[in-house]
């Protein structure tokens, strides 16, 4: 799949890339102009400097990087974030610091990963009743904790 892109203010940064042959996600880089302090418990919007033209029938999902989450408590607030095929603006990442220490984010740091996925369009059909299942209406915690 080919994805067209514009570098908005990230000409000095690597393009998103798969870090291993088996990777599902491409790493995204922080295109901040200067270091950003992310205090513990705070949220920041991090630019990537990229705009994409995702092929119709696909989306990009923006996900956290597990190493940042484990080591520093740095994760994404809305995960996965969805980039629709018809969006042409800059990809930005909503980052939250859940760690107990402040975190300094530097330009060029790998901040998130992007996974492309096919999109199926749903067609809703109203019915009088739904078929029965073993689970039924069992919701949160219905199988135990």
Curated annotation (Swiss-Prot):
GO molecular function ontology, one term from the record: magnesium ion binding
Binding site for substrate: 65-67, 78, 82-84, 92
Cofactors required: Mg(2+)
Superkingdom: Bacteria
Known catalytic reactions: dUTP + H2O = dUMP + diphosphate + H(+)
Any single GO BP term: dUTP catabolic process
Pfam families linked to this entry: dUTPase (PF00692)
InterPro entries xrefs: dUTPase, dUTPase-like, dUTPase-like_sf, dUTPase_trimeric
Entries under SUPFAM superfamilies matching the protein: dUTPase-like
EC code: 3.6.1.23
Keywords per UniProt: Hydrolase, Magnesium, Metal-binding, Nucleotide metabolism
Listed pathway(s): Pyrimidine metabolism; dUMP biosynthesis; dUMP from dCTP (dUTP route): step 2/2
Similarity field: Belongs to the dUTPase family.
Function: This enzyme is involved in nucleotide metabolism: it produces dUMP, the immediate precursor of thymidine nucleotides and it decreases the intracellular concentration of dUTP so that uracil cannot be incorporated into DNA.
NCBIfam families, alphabetized: dut, PRK00601.1
Protein name according to UniProt: Deoxyuridine 5'-triphosphate nucleotidohydrolase
Organism: Syntrophomonas wolfei subsp. wolfei (strain DSM 2245B / Goettingen)
Phylogenetic lineage: Bacteria, Bacillati, Bacillota, Clostridia, Eubacteriales
Gene behind this protein: dut
């Amino acid at each position: 799949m080919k994805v067209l892109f514009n570098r908005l203010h990230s000409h000095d940064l690597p393009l998103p890339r798969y870090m291993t042959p088996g990777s599902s996600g491409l790493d995204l880089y922080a295109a901040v102009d200067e270091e950003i302090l992310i205090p513990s418990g705070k949220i920041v919007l991090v630019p990537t400097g990229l705009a994409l033209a995702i092929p119709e029938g696909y989306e990009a999902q923006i996900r956290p990087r597990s190493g940042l989450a484990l080591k520093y408590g740095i994760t994404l607030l809305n995960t996965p974030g969805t980039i629709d095929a018809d969006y042409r603006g800059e990809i930005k990442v909503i980052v939250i610091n859940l760690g107990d220490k402040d975190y300094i984010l530097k330009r060029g740091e790998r901040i998130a990963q992007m996974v492309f996925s096919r999109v199926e369009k749903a067609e809703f059909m109203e019915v009088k009743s739904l078929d029965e299942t073993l689970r039924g209406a069992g919701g949160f915690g219905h199988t135990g904790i």
